[in-house]
Design a protein with these regions (language model features):
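Active-site beta-loop-alpha junctions enriched in small/polar residues
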Residues: 64-66, 100, 126-130, 170-173, ...
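Beta/alpha (TIM)-barrel catalytic core signal, keyed to glycine-rich beta->alpha loops juxtaposed to Asp/Glu
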Residues: 4, 44, 179-227
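Generic structural signal for well-ordered alpha-helices
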Residues: 84, 107, 111, 153-154, ...
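N-terminal binding-site loop/beta-alpha segment at the start of enzyme catalytic domains
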Residues: 2-122
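Short, acidic/polar
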Residues: 74-86, 145-158, 208
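Acidic-and-aromatic substrate-binding clefts and catalytic sites of carbohydrate-active enzymes
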Residues: 98-106, 174-178, 226-227
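Active-site groove signature of glycoside hydrolases
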Residues: 158-174
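Conserved, mostly hydrophobic/aromatic
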Residues: 61, 95, 110, 123, ...
């Protein structure tokens, strides 16, 4: 597949996830089905390997706006679950969430949606913002203190209705906490079986190298708009 086709294909999938939450139930479902049925999306069932052994579909579905949109519309929970399950039926096995989205609520939606096929998909979610784990209130700055990470992961597991996070990202690098301490904490969670792989979002190259020296980094997530 040519680079232009890859971008166009991914753009169609992203369009389904971005537009669907603000449409009516029937319109958004039809739009998503049309996107995934497009001849240009034949590659959606192709697999990609992240790191050494994490296999995912070539296109993933982000659920960031499934609890609210930038237009402040509150989407239908039933509709959002249907979109996630439709994506799975069409070959998507990678689903991306974050504690900060909601906060908390998109993880709950995703957790409910994938119950019937949890062991057949990869869930990735993110920690790093300073969010009160009891109230969900967003506090100033970042928080990647190891004790906070552990509390956040426990909450993730409950909301996602799972016993492990397939791919855990640090949402933003915390300048107050050495990356070695962050990765050391994640390494402990991996040993406990609560996290299987980890990645970094928006890191600098030096941070990646320091992190990778402690434990292999599986994936890097950077801002790149296809639309």
């Amino acid at each position: 597949m040519k680079r232009r086709d890859v971008i166009k294909t991914a753009g169609l999938a992203l369009l389904g996830s971005v537009v669907a939450p603000i449409d009516s139930y029937s319109a958004s479902t039809k739009s998503l089905n049309n996107a995934f049925n497009s001849d240009e999306l034949n590659g959606v069932s192709n697999k990609r390997k992240l790191g050494m052994n994490l296999e995912v579909s070539s296109i993933g579905l982000g659920v960031q706006n499934m609890s609210r949109t930038y237009q402040t519309t509150i989407p239908s929970r039933t509709e959002m679950i249907n979109i996630i399950r439709t994506a799975y039926d069409k070959g998507v096995t990678l689903f991306d969430a974050a504690v900060a989205s909601g906060p908390f609520e998109v993880e709950r939606i995703l957790g409910d949606a994938v119950v019937p096929f949890r062991d057949k998909v990869v869930i990735e979610t993110k920690f790093g913002w300073n969010i009160d784990q009891e109230t969900g209130n967003r506090l100033p700055g970042l928080n990647s203190h190891p004790d906070h990470i552990k509390r956040v992961v426990e909450g993730m597991l409950k909301r996602l209705r799972t016993d492990r996070i397939d791919l855990l990202y640090q949402h933003r690098v915390d300048p107050q906490i050495p990356i070695e301490d962050v990765v050391g904490c994640i390494q402990d969670l991996i040993k406990e079986g609560k996290v299987l792989h980890y990645g970094l979002s928006e890191p600098g190259i030096k941070t990646v190298r320091r992190a990778h020296a402690i434990h292999p980094v599986t994936a890097i997530q950077n801002e790149y708009s296809l639309l």
